[in-house]
């Protein structure tokens, strides 16, 4: 029987006790039948298996109230519904004193008049300007969805296209001569009814029309009313009782008064300066400058007083005597020549023997000094090793190349092999004996010949070694590659690219210890 009576079903033969219904309405016996309706719902509205507090209610009253409140809140919070509720015409006040162009659209950063944010309104939908002298409004449409202009039907207006090639239209009061042709040419017609005249503007079209109070523009659902800004009248225009004498003048309106005008008194209030007589005033001494013509022997340097100001640290020199010219240290008093002392190892004989005679003039003494200094500079000229090497290489190259060509060895190929071997070798410097065993061509050369060839190459440096090694043999000269003096750009680029190749140090990096660690016992 358990499968016939589930837990929520009523017990057969038991009367239903429902608080909403009277107990006499239901049958005392309920017959359980399978395959057809258990109760007649036309007579009984809601047969419930078990009584509860919410029997007969379609929903809880508390839930119903909260749902209604939520609906009203959502309706107010929705921006689209708010616009519908609060929708009204937007007013544009045109300033007669300002003929500038105003932008109308939904983007705040680029527009002067902001429209609601709707998808059918462009960011910059239109541009409007007002010309007060002609009482005309110029309207340019920049929106994709266009706009419509509505004017009150107060006067007869006609839509004209003055220029056939431009999208420019004009509303005029005079009827054009060929009205039929104009309508066919521009394809626009005025829609007239009892109250308004309206026409549509597409994107890129411009129209000028006279300002009429009560005109408005429809931006695909948003209405914009046009009005003129009220300007406060000037006090002197409408008021005839304006007192000019008692009015307050501004600074710009004040007149400048000259000192010679009658408004200024001629009495001097400032006391005049008077000289105070001094009984025993010191007499001013007149300083006379001495003549600058004097003999050079008697000229003496006077002490120079330095004057410094606290603002600057510049030294002001005021020499009272002319400055003595620096010349060669030759004194003609005893007819002797004083020369600058030379180093001890390069002392040359004095010119006392040649200048003892008193008949030598100043020009001869200068010539003698110049001759001696020239001889001294020629004897003490030091030639750098690089210059010596360059001179010797220029003289030796033809001889070496001739001797090598007789053996069938090209000089350029030999230089190329030696430079490449020293540039790309793992050793920083290579002894001469190892360079002799590079290939068959270098092995044919003797040490002296190979040394001469190496001296002619500018990008190969030499390390001269003197002495003997442990076995008693003399130490050999070692040669290295100098990249800065190399003429081959290709070898330079290849050498610089292979600079970071792996060395002995890189294989030991993984064993390097970067911090102190206590040694293990």
UniProtKB/Swiss-Prot annotation:
Subcellular location: Nucleus
Modified residues (Phosphoserine): 281, 295, 302, 384
Gene3D superfamilies per UniProt: 2.60.200.20
GO cellular component: chromatin; nucleus
CDD domains, per database record: FHA_PLM2-like
Inducing factors: Regulated in a cell cycle-dependent manner, peaking in G1 phase. Negatively regulated by transcription factor SBF (SWI4-SWI6 cell-cycle box binding factor).
Coiled-coil zones: none
Post-translational modification: Phosphorylated by CDC28.
Family to which this protein belongs: Belongs to the PLM2/TOS4 family.
This protein's name: Protein PLM2
Organism: Saccharomyces cerevisiae (strain ATCC 204508 / S288c)
